[in-house]
Swiss-Prot record:
PROSITE patterns: FE2OG_OXY (PS51471)
Gene Ontology MF: a single term: L-ascorbic acid binding
GO biological process terms, semicolon-separated: anthocyanin-containing compound biosynthetic process
InterPro entries, alphabetized: DIOX_N, IPNS-like_FE2OG_OXY, IPNS-like_sf, Oxoglu/Fe-dep_dioxygenase_dom, Plant_2OG-oxidoreductases
Name of the featured protein: Leucoanthocyanidin dioxygenase
Domain Fe2OG dioxygenase as annotated: residue spans: 211-313
Phylogenetic placement of the source organism: Eukaryota, Viridiplantae, Streptophyta, Embryophyta, Tracheophyta
Pathway per the UniProt entry: Pigment biosynthesis; anthocyanin biosynthesis
Family to which the UniProt record says this protein belongs: Belongs to the iron/ascorbate-dependent oxidoreductase family.
Enzyme class per UniProt: oxidoreductase
């Protein structure tokens, strides 16, 4: 198995190369499905990622709140069962805070390379937090067109502040504030998803660690311009092992979802947060909620940046199927976050192909 260190993709992109190294070229069977992401995003025909409006879900008016929660329950349930991904709008996190998070991340990646390298991780020794590029850890030595910055942002007592960027100065306060708001949003979503399964509101959150143990890990994905985007992927097809994944981006398209046997490009919805259902929730829901296979395309015109926050149970947490209503399948097996996830394609509960991916597998 190949475990060589990848070069910084940003350096390759800025070097003026016209052809990408062979390690970044996808297998022939994948190339036929990689199109121009800007043209793909313009398409209005065919299935579209659903949008869920959370406005007034916490209204002080009890009647309004009840009506909104019932609507959101049905819409979230439908989106989670059919897609496993959705755009959240009116989610309660201010545009100002989201902009601060984005500006801080963009500013960090605009620093000189020698400054970013001060925060470099050491994947070979198991130190995955920090600035890095994906290791070639499959048999072919294949690489993805991406650099990243990864670190745990919540709970507060588990943060390693020594690896948080000191520049820009707003990186720490913006990220800390965002983590608190996002943790609150996760509670709201898990509550509604629990109700959609016929469970009490707090059941799913309890199963993934509760307020005290659920981890929020942030990965800023930086996809430089690519001279041959038709041959490469920013991130290859995978599902997330998280419970939920929340994603911001810089309004450059690139996210694709594998839906009904085809790759669907997510549109750029202003002021939205993209949310994925992760493998953990698929397990807890006995496969009723779907962890969707997804990937990231690149382009030659614009840098794409996304901010993914993985909401994960602690590694020692045993994940069991939850009792979904009365006629749920009996608990028969479990998955533990202690067990390593293979870096290969496997089959999900719905029979579709997937490559299991964890933010700890970078």
């Amino acid at each position: 198995m190949v475990t060589s260190v990848a070069p910084r993709v940003e350096s390759l992109s800025s070097s003026g190369i016209q052809s990408i190294p062979k390690e970044y070229i996808r297998p022939q069977e994948e190339l036929t499905s990689i199109g121009n992401v800007f043209e793909e995003e313009k398409k209005d025909e065919g299935p579209q990622v659903p949008t869920i409006d959370l406005k007034d879900i916490e209204s002080e008016d009890e009647v309004v709140r009840r009506e909104i929660r019932e609507r959101c329950r049905e819409e979230l349930k439908k989106a989670a069962m059919e897609w496993g991904v959705m755009h959240l709008v009116n989610h309660g996190i201010s545009d100002d805070l989201i902009n601060r998070v984005k500006v801080a991340g963009e500013t960090f990646f605009n620093l000189p390379m020698e400054e970013k390298e001060k925060y470099a991780n050491d994947q070979a020794s198991g130190k995955i937090a920090g600035y890095g590029s994906k290791l070639a850890n499959n048999a072919s030595g294949q690489l993805e067109w991406e650099d990243y910055f990864f670190h745990l942002i919540f709970p507060e007592d588990k943060r390693d502040m020594t690896i948080w960027p000191k520049t820009p100065s707003d990186y720490v306060p913006a990220t800390c504030e965002y983590s608190v708001k996002l943790r609150s949003l996760a509670t709201k979503i898990l509550s509604v998803l629990s109700l959609g399964l016929g469970l009490e509101e707090g059941r799913l959150e309890k199963e993934v660690g509760g307020m005290e143990e659920l981890l929020l890990q942030k990965k800023i994905n930086y996809y430089p311009k690519c001279p041959q985007p038709e041959l490469a992927l920013g991130v290859e097809a995978h599902t997330d092992v998280s419970a939920l994944t929340f994603i911001l981006h810089n309004m450059v398209p690139g996210l694709q979802l594998f839906y009904e046997g085809k790759w669907v490009t997510a549109k750029c919805v202003p002021n939205s947060i993209i949310m994925h259902i992760g493998d953990t929730i698929e397990i807890l829901s006995n496969g009723k909620y779907k962890s969707i296979l997804h990937r990231g395309l690149v382009n030659k015109e614009k840098v794409r940046i996304s901010w993914a926050v993985f909401c994960e149970p602690p590694k020692e947490k045993i994940i069991l199927k939850a009792h979904c209503q009365r006629r749920c399948l009996r608990l028969s097996h479990h998955s533990s976050h202690l067990a390593p996830f293979p870096n290969i394609f496997s089959t999900s509960s719905s029979g579709r192909p997937r490559r299991l991916y964890s933010p700890n597998e970078l």
